[in-house]
């Protein structure tokens, strides 16, 4: 690939599409990769995240909705920081649950009712 045709992925609109002879090249908004088996929607729009970052983003959104916070950094495998229990507990990741505010509780109830997860 000609490096002159490949623009930098550091644009504010991260799903940068660059013209090439065969089509367009996308760039992930999180990890800046250009090759992935599937492009996923993210905070900057449809098809702005690679497969791995899209799955990670979706899991993060779900955990925030339920009030669960997992302390983790996903920038590189070496820099992953997980809040672990002491080594005597086998190194299990700790999930911290915060109390839901009134609006969040109402939103969660509506979500569960719409998914028919709650039986009356």
UniProtKB/Swiss-Prot annotation:
Disulphides: none
Functional summary from the UniProt entry: Transcriptional regulator that specifically binds 5'-GATA-3' or 5'-GAT-3' motifs within gene promoters.
GO BP annotations listed: lateral root development; regulation of DNA-templated transcription; response to light stimulus
Compartments it resides in: Nucleus
Keywords from the named record: DNA-binding, Metal-binding, Nucleus, Transcription, Transcription regulation, Zinc, Zinc-finger
Similarity comment: Belongs to the type IV zinc-finger family. Class B subfamily.
A GO MF term: zinc ion binding
Protein's recorded name: GATA transcription factor 23
